[in-house]
Amino acid sequence: RQTDAFTPGGVMGKRPDYAVTVYCNLIRRSFRDVPIIIGGIEASLRRLAHYDYWSDKLKRSILLDSQADLLLYGMGERSIVEVADALNDGMDVHDITYIDGTVFRVKAPDENLSYLRLPDYQSLLENPKKYAESFYLQYQNTDPFSAKRLLEPYGVQEFVVQNPPQKPLSQQEMDHVYGLPYCRTYHPSYEKLGGVPAISEVRFSLASNRGCFGACSFCALTFHQGRIIQTRSHESILDEAEKMTHEPDFKGYIHDVGGPTANFRQPACKKQLTKGACQNRQCLFPTPCKNMIADHSDYVALLRKLR
């Protein structure tokens, strides 16, 4: 690429490859004893051993290469508050091993806890089938109602532990999160550098849901947000849309309403709300489940209200 849409002015070369790892190592060099907690899409999708396209190699958990102390995967609203409360109470970051939606490293697993043991990292390097087996086990444990605690060995004295994911947010919680007073733009200091081009795609868009029960093999959304759909209320979305119209750069139209799975406005079936997603089959493959609720009326009603 000749430009970088996420950099001021679209200039290439300002952001390093493996940004989380680079920045964390620089922080660790300057602030040796400060807790480093990572999250976001890069950390989430590299939380355990993973294939890296840039280097064409299997890489270790980003938690090890970045030298971070704790990793929060998924959307993280609940887990980040729990971690902040624990640190505020004086707890050492290395003792924060009990929060759902987190990944941490240890020299030896706790014998009082149960784990689902993944193939060790060395076996992944030696046998591609072991890597497929490992990812399948990870994929089978993305549901907060049934997921087990995962243990990934790196030799005999280093282990990465993934706690089960956080429970989905309720609609009230979703409304609260998206109702916070966000600035909806980049930092003003970037303006003189040409602004950040990527903001144009999202500044006047509305997120209405998260999660996906589609399970497409080319997509990582389920691995990041889970299979259970979570939605905002119509009132929350309409309120944000109204505020958007007062933005000085608003052109009179909304770019997008929804997200990758915009037409999913409810869990695939009623069972998912109390028991989670099925472990023995997918919602849509090889044929749609008979219990799946296929109804777009709520989304259509939302779009009509926004119009």
For each predicted feature, which ranges?
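N-terminal [4Fe-4S]-dependent radical SAM core
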Residues: 129, 133-205
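Conserved alpha-helical substructure of the radical SAM core
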Residues: 225-253
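Conserved, mostly hydrophobic/aromatic
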Residues: 69, 177, 212, 216, ...
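Generic structural signal for well-ordered alpha-helices
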Residues: 20-28, 84, 174, 241, ...
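N-terminal pre-triad scaffold of radical SAM enzymes
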Residues: 193-220, 253
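Conserved SAM/AdoMet-binding glycine-rich loop
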Residues: 34, 243-307
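Glycine-rich beta-alpha loop elements in corrinoid/cobalamin-binding modules
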Residues: 1-155
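Flexible glycine/acidic-rich beta-alpha junction loops that bind and position SAM and/or redox cofactors
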Residues: 1, 45-47, 77-85, 106-109, ...
